[in-house]
Amino acid sequence: MDQTFQLVSDYSPQGDQPKAIEQIVTGIQNGKKHQTLLGATGTGKTFTMSNVIQAVNKPTLVMAHNKTLAGQLYSEFKQLFPNNAVEYFVSYYDYYQPEAYVPSSDTFIEKDASINDEIDKLRHSATSSLFERRDVIIIASVSCIYGLGSPEEYRDLVLSIRTGMEMDRNSLLRKLVDIQYDRNDINFVRGTFRVRGDVVEIFPASRDEQCMRVEFFGDEIERITEVDALTGEIKGERHHVSIFPASHFVTREEKMKKAIANIEVELEERLSVLRKEEKLLEAQRLEQRTRYDLEMMAEMGFCSGIENYSRHLTLREAGATPYTLLDFFPKDFLLIVDESHVTLPQVRGMYNGDRARKEILVNHGFRLPSALDNRPLKFEEFEEKVGQAVYVSATPGPYELEHTPEMVEQIIRPTGLLDPVVEVRPIEGQIDDLIGQIHDQIAKDERVLVTTLTKKMAEDLTDYLKEIGIKVRYLHSEVKTLERLEIIRQLRLGTFDVLIGINLLREGIDIPEVSLVAILDADKEGFLRAERSLIQTIGRAARNANGRVIMYADKMTHSMEVAINETKRRRQIQQAYNEQHGITPQTIQKRIPEVVQATYAAEETGDYKASSTSSKKLGKKERQATIERVEAEMKQAAKELNFERAAELRDVLLELKAEG
């Protein structure tokens, strides 16, 4: 297999890109540890980094600071590298409430989580790709610095089978159970296997469509085929297949026995400390919880919350650095930190928050002290694990400035687009002025982003604009990742014209259709109106030839002045380049992709709304006709075994009858 990166694109590097690519590639080849690409918004930083990846040909980890941006980057890299392994590694929780204890009210909050099966599959796909090939790009969120199992153990437990191999059926079944696969002859899903006579079908943890069918003749593997799990259609013959463990926290039996013995020793030591301190309730609680976990581990090889025992399972010393996704990469991997001014501070802050919560659990007998070693990396540990890094940002932070005094600048856009014109208008009458601007944009079939300071203001403004007939949506922190990507897609498609947000419209949100960004209360100094935030927000209008920004402010703050001056400086450089090369600015033409399957497939997208009009507006005869129609639809749906739709229609029917 060809293990080189192959960039597939209709474009070649333009403007500042060739120079930036050459500088970064030379830096990597010369062994530079840190480099920063200071790239203005819309200058094609992703395309530049793709060219760098192709040139240096190293396995690459691309870190983003949230799932939305990671999803967007995953889509882009997938298109640019269709022949290579582009993987996605983010937290697999749609919802996550870590276990916690509140001493003041004596409240223990059990861990509660909703795991996104699709993202779990992609995480397994990412780690297995790293062991199978070198042409791998993994797009990850900051969750990649959280503890995973030992990569050596994971690699050693890979089940390698080939045709002609001597192995009886029961040995294969035992080995599958050892690597956390469940036997399920009825519900055949990822991470399970089923048995039919001399045929074993295995559904790898990293797949969701194809399974492996292994056929035995006596004690020999006669045939291996790749099969569509749903239809049973044979997709191809395989002479060799590697089955990777179904859990990243997988341990061999002898190691598990050793780990259990070590946990028992730690438990006894901790119980004696708690009893000496007369913390009898805590001691009893700890003993009960830990003994239950030990029993599960001895019988099943697994328990709920097994990650809290990861130090023992990997036989590490107390306080030792945990294994993370970074350990699954070869030593010479390349790290690219996107929007580094936000991502690096996130990495820095992860350890302390996690530690504070776990210390309370340990002190009150909910966990053993070794649970403190199931943690994210400290920033110094993260630095040690990274060989070479490229930080990418339009507004580099203090860390980048300190480590890369000479930055690689990328200011010219391949499309000739200029940084937007920034205008300052008074706060008085800002909403009326904004409405006038919105109507102008809608007339030109262009979109508007509005950024406010508070959630309440965003909600009130959204309601007010809706009342006067403007198609508007509000993007807030409670909107799920998957929904957020869909909202941005709907804005691009023109389903609505105005998107309002607080801090969600800054880094990396790529919407070429937006030609106006309105910043309300721009003169209120603070995190949301700091110079970096303002430059990033201004950048949202830099992908459209008519891009402009209106700041509503009564005074010119230092942050506003810096942001406006930097925008002017870049605009002058861009204008001079365009005049010299006879370039006319053109809005970026960017395909509107389907929402990335990596983050969306686990969501149910079927629309089960009844086709009735609002019952409030119906007369008596119309209501009766609607009731009959909905009832007929409901019965038809039930006949077709479409029970979700039938249930939805039943609820509508009850409403209609209640109002009658």
Swiss-Prot record:
Biological process, per Gene Ontology: nucleotide-excision repair; SOS response
GO molecular function: ATP binding; ATP hydrolysis activity; DNA binding; excinuclease ABC activity
Ranges of residues in domain Helicase C-terminal: 430-592
UVR domain ranges (all copies): 624-659
SUPFAM superfamilies to which the protein is assigned, alphabetical: C-terminal UvrC-binding domain of UvrB, P-loop containing nucleoside triphosphate hydrolases
Subcellular location: Cytoplasm
Residue ranges of domain Helicase ATP-binding in the record: 26-413
Keywords: ATP-binding, Cytoplasm, DNA damage, DNA excision, DNA repair, Excision nuclease, Nucleotide-binding, SOS response
Identification of the protein by name: UvrABC system protein B
Organism: Shouchella clausii (strain KSM-K16)
The organism's taxonomic lineage, starting at the top: Bacteria, Bacillati, Bacillota, Bacilli, Bacillales
Name of encoding gene: uvrB
